[in-house]
């Protein structure tokens, strides 16, 4: 796979996940937030006011489950980025979700959501 194909899949997956969360009443606060310590794909606020940091992994093959790509090291980077993003903001409950998106050969997408993931390796 090429870098362009991988980027296309990533954007496709992130758009799909953001729309699914929005359909469930979440406010999509930010996307692709990057700090020197790490990046967050999607930041959303739940209907209950909880800030949710969402890592999206998209795959078009089943060689490796997308969620397995979220290692403890990756989660540490996400936690650090979340800490940076939260600086100076009002206190809120937070949650870390990992969403694995699969794109089949017909371009159909489905997702598996892991809510409240703290250390990776769903």
From Swiss-Prot:
Pfam families, per the entry: UPF0102
Source organism superkingdom: Bacteria
Sample GO molecular function, one term: nucleic acid binding
InterPro entries: Restrct_endonuc-II-like, tRNA_endonuc-like_dom_sf, UPF0102_YraN-like
Similarity field: Belongs to the UPF0102 family.
PANTHER family from the UniProt entry: UPF0102 PROTEIN YRAN (PTHR34039:SF1)
Protein name: UPF0102 protein DIP1513
Origin species: Corynebacterium diphtheriae (strain ATCC 700971 / NCTC 13129 / Biotype gravis)
Upper lineage: Bacteria, Bacillati, Actinomycetota, Actinomycetes, Mycobacteriales
